[in-house]
């Protein structure tokens, strides 16, 4: 098995988000691409990663290979990764995976392949009242500002805009609209609002580095879905249960 990806920072952003969710994770590496599903211990949030083989510079995977890893260790390993560095993933045996960070200086790490059981994911058929495409940088800033003043994010929308806010001793409210350019598109069924734990959103905010826009979908008292579409067809989906009063 040999896989080459030309920007290690994408993997770094994904692992940073996984680190907040789970201690261990499992890459299911198949001839057609890589998948990963993880659920946090409280079963409040879920992350699904889909990386098709077409998005890689090289992808030689003759048969399925499962790569289990400790997220804290992997995060430390990738911490020094720099812009435009490639990551090379190789394995000659099931026990050890060789990771090479290739740039001005090559760094090689032999990582033990640990046994990680895939999570049991219930089948869900979610219907959303609102589907909005929001500027990822603006969304990141809004989550960070709300996390400073509150533990709950309130999100609402109408046909023209999406509003996120948090209230504690102070109040923060951020509006995304087409007029400001922060809202690229919105699919509207009916006016809706819901509440979510802002700490969970802040924990995965590194995913905003993967794409220029994030697709945000929600409905009253239903999970929020965030979708990050990467160049080359990769996709990261995050689901967060609502915070019920």
Curated annotation (Swiss-Prot):
Pfam families: PCNA_C (PF02747), PCNA_N (PF00705). This is DNA polymerase sliding clamp 1. Belongs to the PCNA family. The keyword Transmembrane does not apply. The gene is pcn1. Homotrimer. The subunits circularize to form a toroid; DNA passes through its center. Replication factor C (RFC) is required to load the toroid on the DNA. One of its GO terms (molecular function) is DNA binding. It comes from Sulfurisphaera ohwakuensis. The lineage of its organism: Archaea, Thermoproteota, Thermoprotei, Sulfolobales, Sulfolobaceae. Keywords: DNA replication, DNA-binding. Sliding clamp subunit that acts as a moving platform for DNA processing. Responsible for tethering the catalytic subunit of DNA polymerase and other proteins to DNA during high-speed replication. PROSITE patterns: PCNA_1. One of its GO terms (biological process) is regulation of DNA replication. InterPro entries: DNA_clamp_sf, Pr_cel_nuc_antig, Pr_cel_nuc_antig_C, Pr_cel_nuc_antig_CS, Pr_cel_nuc_antig_N. Signal peptide: none annotated.
